[in-house]
């Protein structure tokens, strides 16, 4: 039999309840405030509901400290993790203004809740962060390669990671704009932009 303390301890563990559509729609009258709602409420929300409306409550919050497989993000719309290799992060910052068209297409949250944890839910973010992790692993060997050899090596690494890294040989670019951007960042990071 459970002791009184064990029973109370189990009963006091309240599982966070996800945010539902009605609660969101009528938030002004029901006491729900998206600005002060605990992160656990957002993490307990269904991914489809989170993408449809609930993520808006996190849009202006800078206290999120999102962590996905060791990658750290400060904001729900961040594409590139802040704790990737510093040369890679700098290359992304330098190239971003030349790729505004690609970034303007990235609407909505870059993460969704899944089983109480954040997961990346954006093709560009997946490609760039994977490339950033691989850059850190292959940094020294990639620095010495010429442009053609590096592109082939990069395509192989991305393909092994589950990405479609097909090259359009007539244009000399990757067919997928997300992979092309990840390649451009990795290429700039190795000092051969």
Curated annotation (Swiss-Prot):
The gene is ipi3. This is Internal protein III. Internal protein III is one of four proteins in a complex that functions in bacteriophage head maturation. It comes from the Viruses. The record marks 10-11 as: Cleavage. Residues 1-10 form a propeptide. It comes from Enterobacteria phage T4.
